Amino acid sequence: MSRIRQYESNAERQRAYRKRRKRSVHFSSKSDNWRTPEWLFRALNEEFTFDVDVCASAENTQLPVFYDKKTNGLKQKWTGSCWMNPPYGRTIGKWVQKAYVSARRNNAVVVCLIPARTDTKYWHRYCAKAEVRFFQGRLKFNNAGPAPFPSAVVVFKRNGTAVTIYVSRYGSYVIIVMIFERAETC
């Protein structure tokens, strides 16, 4: 239950609002870092055998090779099989674009766990051209309870097939299949 706060002046109220807004994260979540559920990472790693975690920290990586804030994954060349669970804040579009471009130009396979924000520009520009796996219900992340948003696994490949899949812990089934004849230039 939240309590109502009384402010002495309009200026004090505005300062408090700016302070709260600065602390908050885009998409109405208290954090923009969500550690991948173990069961999901294990299943995807078994399928794709990841070489590198392209945006991690020493505390949350599940792979021996990873890029953190210091090494800045956005500035690295992504090749091979890449895992990406990016910060879910304002920079997520840059991460998704980098995944798409790396798949097209570097022949990387980039598997992303991201919020299913189908109304965003990056979703329409990039995710719509990839394999997308939606989850039944909301994921429960390792460092928190259920996410306040729906999630999806997006798989970028050079000559990938755009496929939409719904996933539950009991299995999955294909909903839509669209085949692109050739890779688009970036």
What are these regions (language model features)?
Residues 19-186:
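Class I S-adenosyl-L-methionine-dependent methyltransferase catalytic core
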Residues 1-22:
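BZIP DNA-binding basic region
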